[in-house]
C-alpha cells in the first residue's frame, strides 16, 4: 500500500487569525498540537503506517518509503517543509513539490501518480484530522474481493449544514450506495460524513476516474466553487457496478480550523498520536 498526504493548500483559515496565536503563522500541518505537528496526528491515525520507533508486524504494515507527501514548492522555500517532514518521519519518505495550488484535492492527489502502482492499493489522507483508525484497518483487511474502495466515515452532527462529503449506506450494512460532495440532499437522507481519508483497493480505480473528470472538467461541490474532489470519484465507481464499504469510526476529530483545533485541545483526552 502507498499512503499519500496532500498538503499543498494555502491554509488561509489559520492565517486570517494568526494574531491570536503565533502557531497559526506556520503552515497548517506544522501547527503544534499537544507537542506534535498537526500532520503527525493525521498519520498517527493510520495504525498500519510504521512510524519511526515502531516495529509493526501486521499484514497491512506500510513502511516509510511508501509514504508520499505533496507540498507547494513556495511553502518549501519559505518554511523548509521537506526538511521538517524528513525530521518528523524519515529520509526515506517521498516528496512531490507543486509549482502552484491545483484545482482541488483530487488533482493534488493525482500529482503522486509517479509513485503509484496501478495494481497496488493506495490511501489518501488529509493532514488536519485525528481519528481512531482500528476499524478502518479491520475493514481493509476483511474487505470483499469485489470491493474497489473503503471510506472511513462518522455520524455527523444534525445541524443542517452540509460541510462534508457524504456516503449513504444500504440499511443495516456497511455497503455504500451513494457518495457526493457537500450534498444537502444526501445529508438529509441520513448519510455518514466522510472524514477526509480515501482508500482504493487498486490505484488504477482512482487514476482512471480522476483523469476522466479532469479531461471533461467535471467539477463538484457548491455552485460557483466547483473543484476536483476525491469523494465523487467513488460515485463513478458505483455507477460502473463496483462495490464500496464504509468504515464507521467511533472517534473523529477535525483539526482543520482554529475552532476545531481549540475544541480538540479542550475536549480530547488523548495526549499523543
Model-derived features with residue positions:
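Conserved N-terminal catalytic core of the sugar/cofactor nucleotidyltransferase
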Residues: 1-8, 12-24, 31-32, 36-124
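Conserved beta-strand segments of alpha/beta enzyme cores
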Residues: 29, 92-94, 175, 243-245
Amino acid at each position: 500500500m502507498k499512503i499519500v498526504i496532500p498538503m499543498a493548500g494555502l491554509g488561509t483559515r489559520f492565517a486570517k487569525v494568526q494574531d491570536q496565536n503565533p502557531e497559526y503563522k506556520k503552515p497548517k500541518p506544522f501547527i503544534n498540537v499537544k507537542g506534535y505537528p498537526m500532520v503527525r496526528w493525521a498519520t498517527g491515525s493510520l495504525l498500519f503506517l510504521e512510524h519511526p520507533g515502531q516495529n509493526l508486524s501486521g499484514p497491512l504494515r506500510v513502511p516509510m518509503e511508501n509514504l508520499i507527501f505533496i507540498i507547494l514548492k513556495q511553502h518549501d522555500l519559505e518554511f523548509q517543509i521537506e526538511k521538517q517532514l524528513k525530521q518528523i518521519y524519515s529520509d526515506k519518505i517521498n516528496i512531490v513539490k507543486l509549482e502552484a495550488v491545483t484545482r482541488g484535492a483530487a488533482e493534488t492527489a493525482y500529482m503522486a501518480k509517479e509513485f503509484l502502482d496501478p495494481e497496488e492499493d493506495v490511501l489518501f489522507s488529509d493532514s488536519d484530522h485525528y481519528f481512531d483508525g482500528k476499524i478502518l484497518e479491520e475493514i481493509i483487511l476483511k474487505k470483499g474481493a469485489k470491493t474497489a474502495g473503503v471510506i472511513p466515515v462518522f455520524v455527523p452532527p444534525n445541524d443542517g449544514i452540509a460541510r462534508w462529503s457524504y456516503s449513504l449506506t444500504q440499511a443495516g450494512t456497511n455497503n455504500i450506495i451513494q457518495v457526493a460532495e457537500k450534498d444537502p440532499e444526501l445529508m438529509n437522507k441520513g448519510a455518514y460524513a466522510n472524514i477526509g481519508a480515501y482508500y482504493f483497493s487498486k490505484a488504477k480505480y482512482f487514476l482512471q476516474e480522476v483523469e476522466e473528470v479532469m479531461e471533461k472538467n467535471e467539477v463538484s461541490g457548491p455552485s460557483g466553487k466547483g473543484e476536483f474532489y476525491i469523494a465523487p470519484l467513488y460515485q463513478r465507481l458505483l455507477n460502473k457496478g463496483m462495490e464500496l464499504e464504509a468504515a464507521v469510526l467511533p472517534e473523529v476529530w477535525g483539526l482543520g480550523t482554529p475552532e476545531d483545533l481549540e475544541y480538540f485541545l479542550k475536549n480530547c483526552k488523548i495526549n499523543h498520536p
